[in-house]
Amino acid sequence: MHYAKIKYRTIENGEGIRISLFVSGCNLRCKGCHNAQAWDFSYGNEFTEETEKKIIDFAKDNSYISGLTVLGGEPFDPRNQETLARFVKRFKEETNKSIWCYTGYVLEKDLLADNGRAHTQYTKDFLNSIDVLIDGPFDIDQRDLTLPFRGSRNQRILKMKDLNLKI
């Protein structure tokens, strides 16, 4: 897996001061996407064990960091899920900080359904480590810059614990 960039101190992609990991690769290609350069799966740098350690160590060494946000590109693209499922679990275990994730897929039909277009053997493990999921494709016709943490009205902020899903 590759990543486009890492921001170590951001406030725009979730509550508090967060680390944002922008992964590479997306086949959804939403019209008006703010990160179209990250559609290419080989864009940016390779996500290595050293990269993981640097992110985790930064979170552990800086108490003001609220957590990690994973966005893209598309974190739930089947090609990214194995690496990210393992990483977010490790991040959660080692830091006990929150994890937010943005996806253009819809939770119920694309991720949870066994025949969902982004469902893989890693999806449930990935979802189990996430505290907040922002789902739904960016829709330029529903764009609304006044919405907190979302770009369009069709996107949802889902607090995973509150959903009581049996994942």
What are these model-predicted stretches?
Residues I130-V132:
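Well-ordered beta-strand positions
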Residues L84-K92, W100, R143-I167:
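P-loop/Walker A phosphate-binding loop and immediately adjacent motor/lid segment at beta-alpha junctions
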Residues D77, D141-Q142:
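Short glycine-rich, flexible loops that bind phosphorylated cofactors or substrates
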Residues M1-Y3, I17, N35-N115, Q121-D125:
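Conserved Radical SAM active-site core
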Residues H2-R29:
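N-terminal pre-triad scaffold of radical SAM enzymes
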